[in-house]
Amino acid sequence: MPLLPEESQWELLTAAGLRNDFQAAWIEGDDRDAIAAELRVDATTTLECDLATALRWMGVGSPTPILWVGPHAPGWTFALALSWDGADFGALDRRVFDFCYARELDEFYGVPGVYGEEGLDDLYLNDDQGDESDLDPHLVAVGRLTGRFVDRAWLAERRTLCRVAS
């Protein structure tokens, strides 16, 4: 795997429609049923869809969090929160790289779990709070640690749109 992706991670996500707030997690594990159970996903209300379809649910004001969940790389699952209430990714009993960026405030919160990891010394990783310019180095770090960067093929994959049970 190369040290850097072919394209800017944040620019790819922005071009795909993630222009506003962004809360997502890279969750260690391939067992999506177990991860869905830990996230308290309501299995009766799911839809397999692409990112463009999932983004139609962004900010709809759902009383319960809406997630888009699916494979990222071998050993890793990706979850995108589509409602700002989001999900409690920190409550998962497994390794998680949790991102949170509020565009309106231009505020990015550092990603717990990446600091101190080997092989990231060449990246400037602000470990507290930052702005939009801090996103790409953190996305590159997560790509290195999970074994896959975001790319156009990744963006085209279908994942599961679901609600978190209240």
Question: Where do the protein language model's features map onto the residues?
Answer:
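Actinobacteria-biased recognition of intrinsically disordered, low-complexity terminal regions
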Residues: M1-G17, D151-S166
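Long, compositionally biased intrinsically disordered terminal regions
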Residues: D93-S166
